């Protein structure tokens, strides 16, 4: 699993490489998710991907397919950020 503040490179379905800063890794309902921020994008729009295993048992990041699951993770991360800001 990547460490926070690490830069990782992901390859999209077209074979293009994209660099992301790992902002946070959180666990929600037994699954782990990476909160990523594109390195070359000026926006503050985070990308949330789910940790999974491929057929060779390697750890990979995959899209969250369910809107409900995405909302749960986004809400959990927002709560964590709000709690940290309050400290």
Curated annotation (Swiss-Prot):
It comes from the Bacteria. Pfam families: DUF1292. HAMAP family: UPF0473. Belongs to the UPF0473 family. This is UPF0473 protein Dred_0776. It comes from Desulforamulus reducens (strain ATCC BAA-1160 / DSM 100696 / MI-1). The lineage of its organism: Bacteria, Bacillati, Bacillota, Clostridia, Eubacteriales.
């Amino acid at each position: 699993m990547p460490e926070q503040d690490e830069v990782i490179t992901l390859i999209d379905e077209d074979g293009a490489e994209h660099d992301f800063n790992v902002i946070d890794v959180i666990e929600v309902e037994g699954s782990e998710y990476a909160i990523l921020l594109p390195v070359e994008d000026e926006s503050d729009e985070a990308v949330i991907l789910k940790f999974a295993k491929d057929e060779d048992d390697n750890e990979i990041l995959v899209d969250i397919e369910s809107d409900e699951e995405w909302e749960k993770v986004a809400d959990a991360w927002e709560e964590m950020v709000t709690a940290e800001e309050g400290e």
